[in-house]
Amino acid sequence: MNQTGLVRSLAAVCLGFTSIVATAQLRHAEPPLHTSGHDILDTAGHRVRLTSVNWYGFDQQDFVAGGLDHAPLATIVKEIVDLGVNSVRLPWANETLEHNPQVPDYAVKANPQFRGRHAMEVMDAVVRALADAHIMVVLDNHVSRADWCCSETDGNGLWYNAEYPESKWLTDWQTIVRRYKSERWVVGADLRNELRNKATWGGTDPKLDWHAASERGGNAVLTANPLLLIMVESPDYSTNFVGFDKLPVRFKIADRLVYSPHAYNIADHPFASYDELKQVYDARAGFLLHTEPGVPLWVGEFGTCQTLDCGANSDWFVMYIRYMKENDLAWSYWAINGTQSSGAGRKYDAIEGYGLLSPDYQHIAAPKLVELLRTIQN
């Protein structure tokens, strides 16, 4: 698709533009949440479609949410509210929780109240600020060792490693869940981010069987807080849910399960048509929308360059927005961050090319991208 075609597609998609007033009405669900068939419901029984942004940092080598070096916490939360989303996926690392290091002064220089504080104290403040704004939070166990994700060799490809064995993974989940148990706006636990190709769904090797591990992890979380949604990703970077219908996840509390596919066009694959894209994504995860008993889907990550001028990647994104709209999918955009955190292959404070916010975290950096996202907020 050339740039003219992209503009035409943008115009077509934006016919479904939802006003901020309408999205505000959707935003104020009443937690805690539960599931019924393919839907997520609030305490009043109203359907809730999670429309979210990822706000990374507690999973990175600076051990703190991105942007606190550029803008007050309240300013960043207001920007999230103004986007019209109703939730935040908040990545964290086992290292951050277990070691709870003192955050570096440079990473919180716009928030002097956090100087000398420890990482989990800052996370407490972030969760509290989001909750005060009635923004729901999904805690995401992104990595074991704090670093940028993801590769096959980064030591974070399974739900455990030598330094952070499964026993710690389970204990850490219970620790962080209990920490926020009294905060009803913390509504979900994304058990583990992007299991790599080595992980299996079932099989004979318990060290690789993510299906069995996800049941152990989910039940551990529900023991600590039975009111949380449990998000389960798939092997192959959470892009392939083949077999989930034949070997479903079963928790001790039945109405808590959500499957969470991820979607990127990393290889800049030039889809020839929307029908081709639809066929690919139906085969990867979309088929679960038509299986019984139903399980809700929440696209926990998807994204593109903020300028929407990156060729096949942008063309893919416009078509994928259409796919999500046609399937009424819940979602979480990667990412809200305007700048990069420290990590492998990253440069601290460099512009985040997929980010929705400006590098000063005080205005939208990607207005066309935000317009597209607003078409799938209702």
Show the residue positions of the predicted features:
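Glycoside hydrolase catalytic-domain groove-lining segments
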Residues: 207-307, 319, 325, 329
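Boundary at the C-terminal end of the N-terminal hydrophobic targeting segment
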Residues: 22-24
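Bacterial N-terminal signal peptides
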Residues: 9-19
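Bacterial N-terminal signal peptides that target proteins for export
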Residues: 1-10
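Short, hinge-like loop/turn segments at secondary-structure boundaries
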Residues: 106-108, 155-158, 247-251, 317, ...
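Glycan-binding loop/region signatures in secreted carbohydrate-active enzymes
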Residues: 54-57, 64, 254, 258-260, ...
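Aromatic-rich peripheral "rim/lid" segments of glycoside hydrolase catalytic domains that contact
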Residues: 309-378
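Active-site mouth of glycoside hydrolases
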Residues: 28-246, 360, 364, 368
